Amino acid sequence: GANCGGCGFAGCRAFADAAVKAPNLDNNYCPVGGNEVMKKVAAILGYEIKEKAPMVAVVRCNGTCENRPRTNIYGGSSSCKVKASLYAGDTACPYGCLGCGDCVNACQFGALSMDETTGLPVVDETKCTACGACVKACPKSIIELRNKGPRGMRVYVSCVNKDKGVVARKACSAACIGCGKCAKVCASEAITVENNVAYIDFTKCRLCKKCVAECPTGAIHDVNFPVLKPKAAPVEEKKEENNG
């Protein structure tokens, strides 16, 4: 077993012990094995299970080197945890990614890597098991497990900055400014704005992408949607001249 602890237990053995002793598997789930493994476990124990929607880790920060200019230089330990304990970060945004890669080091499955151009972690969806190790490793809580979505399609706010709009935008050009325009166009009431930042409830989101088009800063991201081809311009029919 992976012994990643994504199930909430210390390891695979502890999970197995709990599953055997439990009256059902409602509170026991292995994110690495997923529904297929849980079906096999349930069959052995004589239980029934409800399938769960696949999850994936999402990095809720778009503070790239371009969007979020550095204001100072950090020369200490290359650890996000240590860095966060010393100061707010080397940019004007105290909420964003610190860029040291604690999440990458925490991932046992090689699903995370640091992008040298953006300075942000990138999730490989084909390798992510939604074990949650990266979520626990991030001292800024910018990584979240979200519903993977149909055909991998999902919409989320890539920002956690709780400062007022003017301050947040000054620190990062891609920050959510809490204007609420996204919430106003959402017919499914999936978006709320609290503490100056918007959040999309993936259990309510219908993937209409109206909020994406409405966001003035580009803080809302849409992932894995098919690229629509532009409609061809209508061809004007030439009128035949009547020479009489």
For every predicted segment, state its role.
Residues 1-185, 214, 218-244:
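Ferredoxin-type iron-sulfur electron-transfer modules and their immediate structural context
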Residues 181, 191-193, 197-199:
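Strongly charged, low-complexity linkers/loops
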